[in-house]
């Protein structure tokens, strides 16, 4: 028989830097999950990723105080800002343009994000990422 699920916890944690301090500790503590066990497993799973990039994670908590977790890909906005060399997006995205991306840079982001997007093919994924970039005030050339 399957384990009884008592809840899901969604967090964004920097790759390789999970520790018991907030937000990880309180979120797992409320469900009485082993915080250090999660931190060690998360850091081991993200050690090949670029340190410090935020990684969304969905933790499934079970009634027997065990857990499983699924790593998602880094948010598109973070990847767009990184490739465009920005610290933040535009306050008025359709008025003030703060950076530029080429089609090849957008393709690179789309390849990374493809598994988490609902796009049917690569071209649709590229258009999705280009739309996210435009909504941040970043111009996209060739899309």
Swiss-Prot record:
Name of one Pfam family that matches: Ribosomal_L11
SMART domains from the UniProt entry: RL11
Taxon lineage: Bacteria, Pseudomonadati, Pseudomonadota, Betaproteobacteria, Nitrosomonadales
Function: Forms part of the ribosomal stalk which helps the ribosome interact with GTP-bound translation factors.
PANTHER family tied to this protein: 60S RIBOSOMAL PROTEIN L12, LARGE RIBOSOMAL SUBUNIT PROTEIN UL11M
Name recorded for this polypeptide: Large ribosomal subunit protein uL11
GO BP term, pick one: translation
Gene Ontology CC annotations of this record: cytosolic large ribosomal subunit
The organism of origin for this protein: Nitrosomonas eutropha (strain DSM 101675 / C91 / Nm57)
Subunit: Part of the ribosomal stalk of the 50S ribosomal subunit. Interacts with L10 and the large rRNA to form the base of the stalk. L10 forms an elongated spine to which L12 dimers bind in a sequential fashion forming a multimeric L10(L12)X complex.
Record has Cytoplasm as a keyword: no
UniProt entry keywords in alphabetical sequence: Methylation, Ribonucleoprotein, Ribosomal protein, RNA-binding, rRNA-binding
InterPro entries per record: Ribosomal_uL11, Ribosomal_uL11_bac-typ, Ribosomal_uL11_C, Ribosomal_uL11_C_sf, Ribosomal_uL11_CS, Ribosomal_uL11_N, Ribosomal_uL11_N_sf
UniProt record similarity statement: Belongs to the universal ribosomal protein uL11 family.
Processing after translation: One or more lysine residues are methylated.
Molecular function, one GO term: structural constituent of ribosome
